[in-house]
Regions:
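Short, conserved phosphate-binding/catalytic loop or strand-edge motifs used
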Residues: 47-62, 97-102
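Short, basic/aromatic-rich helical patch in the C-terminal catalytic core of site-specific tyrosine
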Residues: 57, 78, 82, 155
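Basic, Lys/Arg- and aromatic-enriched nucleic-acid-binding interface segment
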Residues: 68-77, 87-152, 156, 166, ...
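Short, intrinsically disordered, charge-balanced linker/junction segments flanking boundaries
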Residues: 1-4, 192-197
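C-terminal catalytic core of Y-nucleophile DNA break-rejoin enzymes
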Residues: 114, 174-194
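N-terminal DNA-binding module of tyrosine recombinases/phage integrases
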Residues: 1-55
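C-terminal flanking helix
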Residues: 37, 79-86
Length: 197
């Protein structure tokens, strides 16, 4: 009987403790918790886990249609949480209320700096470096972002042990998509060689 009385808010606590906290990388965990706190729990937190319907989840998704990226991320969190609810015996198998709900199309989120913007940024970094108004590590980090195409977190957590000057690459052991090698061109190698160790 207890399992039928469990609310989505209570399920979310277990989901956090047994999945988010132990299986997700910190950035993803933070995003899952934010989605739960801001969108999912206010919408369906008081409902009984066993009673949540496809219509409830569709309503949550539809209310965020003006921000498709956010709506779709919430759908992913709900889907994972209810998959685990099935695994934990809180719902019958194959009853995930997210099933068959289609995601909204998303606009590509990539934006590249124009040649003029890149030139202006380069000049600003050079000025900041010459005038010593900015931390040299911050300037180097921005340059590495530009020259490598790495994610911000990959550069911010970069260690010297990941840098292979001989092979001209970064060997990143734990990125968002797993281990990967980033090949370094001359500008990136120059930036790295000028950083104090």
């Amino acid at each position: 009987e207890r399992r039928h009385a469990l609310t989505v808010a209570e399920l979310a606590q277990r989901f956090d403790k047994e999945h988010i906290a132990v299986r997700l990388k910190p950035g993803t965990a933070q995003e899952y918790r934010r989605n739960l706190r801001r969108f999912i729990l206010p919408a369906i937190g008081r409902l009984k886990v066993a009673d949540v319907s496809k219509a409830d989840v569709a309503r949550l998704h539809h209310e965020l249609r003006h921000i498709p990226y956010q709506a779709n991320r919430n759908l992913e969190v709900v889907s994972k949480m209810f998959n685990l609810a099935e695994l934990w015996g809180l719902r019958s198998d194959g009853s995930n209320p997210r099933r068959h709900l289609r995601k909204y199309p998303e606009e590509k989120r990539e934006r590249y700096l124009s040649p003029a913007e890149l030139a202006a940024l380069g000049e600003a970094l050079s000025r900041a470096e010459q005038e010593r108004v900015e931390d040299p590590y911050a300037i180097a980090a921005i340059r590495l972002l530009i020259f490598t195409g790495c994610r911000l977190n990959e550069i911010m957590t970069l260690k010297w042990s990941y840098v292979d000057f001989e092979a001209r690459c970064l060997r990143l052991p734990d990125t968002k998509t797993g281990a990967r090698i980033v090949h370094l061109g001359a500008p990136a190698l120059d930036v790295l060689s000028r950083i104090e160790r």
